[in-house]
Amino acid sequence: MKLAYWMYAGPAHLGTLRVASSFKNVHAIMHAPLGDDYFNVMRSMLERERDFTPVTASIVDRHVLARGSQEKVVDNITRKEKEERPDLIVLTPTCTSSILQEDLQNFVNRALTLKDSHADVLLADVNHYRVNEFQAADRTLEQIVRFYIEKAKRENFDFSKNQKISANILGVFTLGFHNMHDCRELKRLLTDLGIEINEIIPEGGNVTNLRNLPKAHFNIVPYREVGLMTAMYLKNEFQMPYISTTPMGILNTAQFIREIETLLKALTQNLSNSSNCEKFNISFAEEAAKILEKDFQKYISEQSRFVSQAAWFSRSIDCQNLTGKRAVVFGDATHAASMTKILSCEMGIRVVCSGTYCKHDADWFREQVRGFCDEILITEDHSQVGDMISRLEPAAIFGTQMERHVGKRLDIPCGVISAPVHIQNFPLGYRPFLGYEGTNQIADLVYNSFTLGMEDHLLEIFNGHDTKQILPKIQFEDGSLEWSKDALEELSRIPGFVRGKVKRNVEKFAQQNNKPFITLELMFAAKEAVNA
């Protein structure tokens, strides 16, 4: 546990609460002291939803510490069951309340013996000291799915496959980066291919429908952070294949579609080789044949040329102005890796550093971005990211809300491509990052993130209606250095898009030569030293 004023991935209980509050008619009870109960406020502020956050805090106070938590926790479970009538109640401690080392599973068992209802009660099986928000969310989703699958098995539920080819989408949940928009785009893409959606979990799903997950023919995991454990469990239990390629960018989306085609061919081949000629198998083979009759490559070509504008835009003169420009990418493993490939392969932008805060997925991330960037950074420390950006001085940053703050401080534009984000990245309008419509959004974001230069320079030359002075914008930050009036005037004549870099180079030269007062002559000397 460490004290920090900024964390990329939150504590484990946030992941559990995000999964629980994504399902319909599921209530979460958080066993926590005051100060850990900020999830309700955070979700109500950020997520654009009409419903209240279904989370109740069972506060650990001095009375609880004096006589134990069992009575209070059990009372909260039974009370919420009567008030909300949920299908499932999820109990979770926080890293703080875990210090008490209480037997919460015993509390759950006690509540189950006292209450008389249909609601299930589940203790989130998460180690709050060893995992972060994403790992806990992944584990909690898998635990809930496993619970209801095992329950269906005991009831001898029929897990036979759907007549029509269908897929589950796993890992779309509340407070995700553009998750709702991405889900809509994925549904559109699958509909175009003739594939039905079986279940989408956890966002908007019912836990009572989790028993239907094995009826689909394959699973889709659009984000590595959440959903992989569930997909692996379903594969081991029901031999369900899954696709974990994120369809972000033209190349990755094409690869995603080709993987679906390959998967359907493999399923059809397995059925044709099987000696079992049931009516269902024949029906499935016919459905698969209809889908495979479509020219997948033709679909990819048409979507890339006519639906996605990014392909031709990347070859236009506007985008060619960005060729060779330097950029830094940082975010979660899924979005940072995909964005690195898009910038490098599709837009010709040089990625000087690509990084992620998902340390648990570091090996996969390195494998994905190796060869597409100059440096790789794996860290949860925002100060290291800020130092790296300051050292490399890129033309643009693509990162989280924290990199946006760093960019403002260093006067470097930043496009937000990954959680954690603030409310402006929970748009009401349709803004997916996945699929072919997502390529248009990404192309706009990339192009608009770079400072074009001449616009700012011309505004400074001609001023327009702006009567503000320019000089106060370029005051030095280091109190040990002082600029002469002539040097400041010369600095103001330098175009805005390179002025910051020139200023930093001059100050660095002055510090190296122990010159506390920067004159016009020192500026010219610094210029000669840099050019040399």
From Swiss-Prot:
Q: Which NCBIfam families match?
A: DPOR_BchB
Q: What is its main location?
A: plastid
Localization (cell)? Plastid, Chloroplast
The residues that the entry says bind substrate are G453, M454
**Biological process per Gene Ontology, one example term:** photosynthesis, dark reaction
Q: Could you tell me what this protein is called?
A: Light-independent protochlorophyllide reductase subunit B
Q: Which family does it belong to?
A: Belongs to the ChlB/BchB/BchZ family.
Q: Which InterPro entries match?
A: ChlB/BchB/BchZ, LI-POR_suB-like_C, Nase/OxRdtase_comp1, P-CP_red_C, Protochl_reductB, Protochlorophyllide_Rdtase
Question: Function of this protein?
Answer: Component of the dark-operative protochlorophyllide reductase (DPOR) that uses Mg-ATP and reduced ferredoxin to reduce ring D of protochlorophyllide (Pchlide) to form chlorophyllide a (Chlide). This reaction is light-independent. The NB-protein (ChlN-ChlB) is the catalytic component of the complex.
Against Pfam families, the record matches this protein to: Oxidored_nitro (PF00148), PCP_red (PF08369)
Q: What HAMAP family does the annotation carry?
A: ChlB_BchB
Keywords per UniProt:
4Fe-4S, ATP-binding, Chlorophyll biosynthesis, Chloroplast, Iron, Iron-sulfur, Metal-binding, Nucleotide-binding, Oxidoreductase, Photosynthesis, Plastid
Which cofactor does this sequence's record say it needs?
[4Fe-4S] cluster
The UniProt entry annotates the active site at D318 (proton donor)
Q: In which pathway does it act?
A: Porphyrin-containing compound metabolism; chlorophyll biosynthesis (light-independent)
Q: Name one GO cellular component term.
A: chloroplast
| Gene name linked to the record | chlB
MF terms (GO), sorted A to Z:
4 iron, 4 sulfur cluster binding; ATP binding; metal ion binding; oxidoreductase activity, acting on iron-sulfur proteins as donors; oxidoreductase activity, acting on the CH-CH group of donors, iron-sulfur protein as acceptor
Spell out the reaction equation it catalyses: chlorophyllide a + oxidized 2[4Fe-4S]-[ferredoxin] + 2 ADP + 2 phosphate = protochlorophyllide a + reduced 2[4Fe-4S]-[ferredoxin] + 2 ATP + 2 H2O
Return the cofactor note field.
Binds 1 [4Fe-4S] cluster per heterodimer. The cluster is bound at the heterodimer interface by residues from both subunits.
How this chain assembles, per its entry, is:
Protochlorophyllide reductase is composed of three subunits; ChlL, ChlN and ChlB. Forms a heterotetramer of two ChlB and two ChlN subunits.
UniProt binding sites for [4Fe-4S] cluster: D36
EC number, UniProt record: 1.3.7.7
User: Which superkingdom, per the lineage?
Assistant: Eukaryota
